[in-house]
């Protein structure tokens, strides 16, 4: 539906540029985020023993958590890159497609095939990202159960 109002793909390109900037800003802040969390724990209003235990648990799990965060940002980066490729293809071959009833209609089978494959890749990356999120939540819940 958005494409029906963005036939020259200017808005789509703008969304891609903004998404890349957001991903870059937040993915580059991953280390800082974990350091900030640790600093907050160090200054938490807890007994020294409780604080040591909390910090030990944080230090034990933060390495894996940071790896997962980096992997999630990598999925986001890949998804946006593939979407960028799609927008570029559609822009470069503007005369080979049109929008009808809020759907792209291709006048060229090879372009349709290429865009479909790229959309399948976006779907696949999204599913892999979601699976990583689910497994991370499951692992976190299991670790919380061990503490309780």
Predicted regions and their residues:
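Extended amphipathic alpha-helical interaction segments
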Residues: 3-106
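A cross-kingdom marker for long, charged
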Residues: 93-148
């Amino acid at each position: 539906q958005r494409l029906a109002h963005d036939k020259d793909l200017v808005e789509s390109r703008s969304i891609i540029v903004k998404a890349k900037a957001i991903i870059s800003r937040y993915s580059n802040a991953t280390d800082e985020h974990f350091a900030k969390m640790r600093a907050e724990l160090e200054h938490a209003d807890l007994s020294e023993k409780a604080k040591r235990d909390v910090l030990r648990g944080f230090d034990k799990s933060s390495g894996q958590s940071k790896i997962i965060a980096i992997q999630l940002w990598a999925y986001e980066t890949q998804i946006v890159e593939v979407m960028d490729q799609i927008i570029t293809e559609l822009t470069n071959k503007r005369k080979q497609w049109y929008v009808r009833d809020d759907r792209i209609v291709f006048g060229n089978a090879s372009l349709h095939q290429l865009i479909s494959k790229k959309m399948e890749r976006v779907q696949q990356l999204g599913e892999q990202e979601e699976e990583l999120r689910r497994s991370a939540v499951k692992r976190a819940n299991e670790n919380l159960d061990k503490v309780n």
